[in-house]
Design a protein with these regions (language model features):
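Electropositive nucleic-acid engagement tracts
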Residues: 43, 47-79, 130, 149-170
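N-terminal juxtadomain amphipathic helix
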Residues: 73-101
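Generic hydrophobic-segment detector
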Residues: 68, 85-86, 144, 148
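Short, positively charged, Gly/Tyr-enriched micro-motifs
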Residues: 2-14, 18-39, 98-170
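Hydrophobic alpha-helical segments, chiefly the membrane-spanning helices
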Residues: 173-175
Length: 175
């Protein structure tokens, strides 16, 4: 067996673990296919897609976390915003949702409930998030699917293609 050693930066540890799990799943799959028998390749495709999806989700989490800005104040559109807290929020991708901790900011001098008192999230602003955590590609894909027919048909298509996990399929109703 060939030995391959890769260095994984600390912020990508979860990505490295997901990659190792994906490789282990691949090895288990190949090891049980001997003997010349027919296989249910649709089942193999599904399993490989789910395993690769976990690696993709870990990558999205690392990238989105890197977009966080954790400082006392930021300037957005020429206006000063003050940090009001940090909390986790879900971000929805083509393969599922990831939770990312990020800072929240409010325009300096404003309070909640006032026109300028809306809380902003730099991760969402920097990533071009649509609505409540929908990353651009998943939002665009569902908007496209929904414009071709009812949202239930878009949901069925997404399920058949194996992309857009259950909670993400509902974005079509909101995009």
């Amino acid at each position: 067996m060939a030995k391959l050693v890769i260095e994984v930066p600390e912020e990508f540890t979860e990505v490295g673990k997901a990659m190792a799990e994906h490789l282990a799943a691949l090895q288990r799959t190949v090891s049980r296919l001997g003997g010349g028998k027919a296989v249910d390749y649709a089942e193999i495709e599904q399993a490989m897609s789910e395993s690769a999806g976990r690696t993709e989700l870990a990558g999205h989490r690392a990238i989105l976390q890197s977009l966080d800005i954790d400082v006392p104040a930021v300037i957005i559109g020429g206006l000063r915003y003050t940090r009001v807290g940090r909390c986790e929020a879900p971000f929805h991708t083509m393969v599922g949702s990831v939770s990312v901790e990020r800072s929240l900011y409010r325009q300096s001098g404003e309070r909640g409930g006032q026109p300028g008192g809306r809380v902003v999230d730099p991760v969402s602003l920097r990533a071009g998030v649509v609505e409540d955590g929908w990353l651009p590609r998943v939002a665009r894909a569902m908007a496209h699917a929904v414009q071709q027919g009812p949202s239930r048909e878009a949901e069925a298509s997404a399920r058949e293609f194996g992309r857009l996990r259950s909670e993400e399929r509902r974005v079509g109703e909101r995009v």
